[in-house]
Amino acid sequence: ESILDILEVKARAGLDVRLVYDDVGCVSTLPAKFYKEIRARGIKCEVFNPFRPIVSVVLNNRDHRKIMVIDGHTGFTGGINLADEYINRKVRFGYWKDTGVMLKGEAVWNFTVMFLQMWSVLTGSTEELQVIPPYQSHSYYKEPFESDGFVQPYGDTPLDHETVGENVYLNIISQ
């Protein structure tokens, strides 16, 4: 069973399953109009920066983030791409290990907001951004989450003129 098959089962069961992919980054690995196949499976799908075979400065305008949010409570991020060559099933680029991070609890809310912000840009609708609820604990997680530190996922985008990533790094360096 592939990840796509599992997502289809969840979407058909009534869960809100959404996918955003960077078309320029997938131009050599996914079929043209891949989003139509995804939507036919009942999965909501939007394409970031649809590929157009012309030389343009927007070819470098990419969204390389990997964000997965499950139930608004568990999130995954990191550098891992979803393809056989990244799990050493197929040798294409050599062998390496990449990092993936799982977060649980309130920090995941930031991933939800980042995803919905991009979704809003791609769909042209701000409706969902107006109703993002604050983080809510789920009843099936009995134990409270505890930590010695502070986790604050953040996002940066070329779509605005704010230098969030640069500011975060400069603040860390200046500590």
Each PLM stretch: what is its role?
Residues 1-175:
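Charged, low-complexity intrinsically disordered terminal segments
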